[in-house]
């Protein structure tokens, strides 16, 4: 029973808890399988020792980091906001548009669960519009839902998670013309190499989210950023928490951009491994495989229960994510992928291929 001074609607929500299996191959969180190089970790340790006074708050407006992000993305510094992971920026965008009964949040589902979760924790109405059978977006259906439900912010992951597919240019152009804030979440940009950044100057209602948690290997540091026209960026600065990004996280993100030629050099291997897993899974008639432009694959068992398959793979040491009636499989190291392939082969008999 909830205490009387707590919001009763929170009683139905579940706290987010990630599973912990230290001995298993972690292919369930879309992290890059490679840690930072040892020399870069040593550099961060040196920067922590020389440049961070732990008794002082971190820089509240990290101008150097914003300038580095702006240079990387081809925008100006006043178009950049940084956050404690993209989650904080999603929360700030909802706060800036919908709080106090002023509007509804929308997205096309299945998709990244935090759009819904963060709206619900803020007591903001959320509408999830169903994707098509192949997980595309029906612009007519989405536009009608936006118009009929008082939507003020529309979140679209591009590529989408858990399905890995990109929106077409035509869909982006059409949805960008809607009279709402349109947020394109490009968390996997470095793998897809598709970005709507050039549209920022044409569409003042467009916001792009990105992260250092995936291709840049900094998931532990929780650094996300938003790109938007300066007016929207200025509002996001008003609603963010003070000192929201720890000093070491700022240094890590700056160093990652400084050495991006080294860190991003791992991406061709990840994409090659993704294609290798795709070729293997395509041989199984009982598995429906979907095209991906990210560092993961989405597969849907045609007959077997997806949760039973997930549990069986976990029992064999390969952790994958159950989602949307299927399985999301992160591309790991070649050795991890070898074990995944062997584990899948062990679960499906030859006649099921």
From Swiss-Prot:
Keyword annotations: Amino-acid biosynthesis, Aminotransferase, Histidine biosynthesis, Pyridoxal phosphate, Transferase
Membrane spanning stretches: none
InterPro entries, A to Z: Aminotransferase_I/II_large, HisP_aminotrans, HistidinolP_aminotransfase, PyrdxlP-dep_Trfase, PyrdxlP-dep_Trfase_major, PyrdxlP-dep_Trfase_small
GO molecular function: histidinol-phosphate transaminase activity; pyridoxal phosphate binding
Enzyme Commission number, as recorded: 2.6.1.9
One Pfam family this sequence matches: Aminotran_1_2
Catalysed reaction equations from the record: L-histidinol phosphate + 2-oxoglutarate = 3-(imidazol-4-yl)-2-oxopropyl phosphate + L-glutamate
Subunit structure: Homodimer.
Residue positions where N6-(pyridoxal phosphate)lysine is found in the record: 214
Similarity comment text for this entry: Belongs to the class-II pyridoxal-phosphate-dependent aminotransferase family. Histidinol-phosphate aminotransferase subfamily.
Name recorded for this polypeptide: Histidinol-phosphate aminotransferase
């Amino acid at each position: 029973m909830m205490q009387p001074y707590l919001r009763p609607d929170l009683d139905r929500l579940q706290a987010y808890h990630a599973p912990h299996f230290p001995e298993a191959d972690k292919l369930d969180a879309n992290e890059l399988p490679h840690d930072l190089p040892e020399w870069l970790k040593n550099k961060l340790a040196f920067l922590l020792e020389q440049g961070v006074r732990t008794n002082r708050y971190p820089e509240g407006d990290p101008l150097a980091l914003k300038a580095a992000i702006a240079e990387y993305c081809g925008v100006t510094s006043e178009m950049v906001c940084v956050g404690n992971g993209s989650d904080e920026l999603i929360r700030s965008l909802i706060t800036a548009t919908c709080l106090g009964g002023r509007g509804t949040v929308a997205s096309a589902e299945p998709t990244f669960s935090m759009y819904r979760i963060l709206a619900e924790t803020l007591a903001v109405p959320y509408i999830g519009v169903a994707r098509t059978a192949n997980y595309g977006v029906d612009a007519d259906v989405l536009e009608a839902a936006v118009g009929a439900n008082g939507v003020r912010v529309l979140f679209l992951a591009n590529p989408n998670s858990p399905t890995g597919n990109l929106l077409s240019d035509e869909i982006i152009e059409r949805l960008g013309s809607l009279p709402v804030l349109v947020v394109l979440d490009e968390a996997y940009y470095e793998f897809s190499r598709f970005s709507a950044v050039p549209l920022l100057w044409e569409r003042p209602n467009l916001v792009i989210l990105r992260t250092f948690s995936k291709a840049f290997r900094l998931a532990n540091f929780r650094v996300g950023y938003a790109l938007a026209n300066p007016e929207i960026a200025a509002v996001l600065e008003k609603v963010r928490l003070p000192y929201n990004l720890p000093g070491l996280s700022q240094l890590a993100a700056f160093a990652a951009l400084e050495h991006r030629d080294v860190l991003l050099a791992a991406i061709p291997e990840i994409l090659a491994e993704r294609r290798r897993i795709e070729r293997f899974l395509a041989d199984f008639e009982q598995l429906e495989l979907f095209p991906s432009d990210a560092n993961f694959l989405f597969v849907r068992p045609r007959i077997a229960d997806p949760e039973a398959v997930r549990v069986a793979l976990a029992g064999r040491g390969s952790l994958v994510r159950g989602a949307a009636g299927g399985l999301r499989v992160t591309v790991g190291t070649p050795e991890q992928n070898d074990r995944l392939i062997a584990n899948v082969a062990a679960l499906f008999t030859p006649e099921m291929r």
